[in-house]
Amino acid sequence: MEKRKFIIQVEFAEKNFCCGLYDEAIGGAVLSTGKTFEELKKGFEDSLKFHIEGNMERGDNLPEDVAKGEYDLEYVLDVPALLRDAERFTTLSALSQICGINKKQLSHYATGEKKARPDKREKIIEGLHEIGRQALAYS
C-alpha cells in the first residue's frame, strides 16, 4: 500500500514563509510560519507531530498510519516562496538569464505584486534546476 501523502501549500507573506494543513486524517488543522523555508518545515513538522500526539492522548480515533507517523509531506511553494527561498543560492539576475523571464518581472513575482501563471512557474522551476545542474558540474 502506498504511503499517505499530505500536500502542504507554502506561501510567502509579509516577511515570512507560511503554510497550513487541514485534514480529517490528522483530526484538525496545523499552521506554521518561519523566517526561512527550512525553519518553516521544522516548525510545521514539529507542530504536526505535537498535534497528532495530543489527539491520540485525548483518545481521538486517527488512522493507524497517521498515528504511527507513517506518512509523507510534500511541500509545494508558490512563486513568491520559490523565489524567496532561491535567494539563498542565486540572484534574480542569474535566474532571469537562465529562464528567460525579465528580472523586473521576477521581482514583481517575488514581492507578490504580480501573480505568475502556471507556465511561468514551471519556467522558474526549470531555471532553478538548470542552475543546480550547472553548479553540480564543478569538481
Residue ranges and their predicted role:
Residues 1-60, 64:
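DNA-contacting interfaces and partner/effector-binding or oligomerization modules
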Residues 42, 108, 126:
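DNA-binding alpha-helical recognition surfaces that contact promoter or target DNA
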Residues 118-137:
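DNA major-groove recognition helix of helix-turn-helix/homeodomain DNA-binding modules
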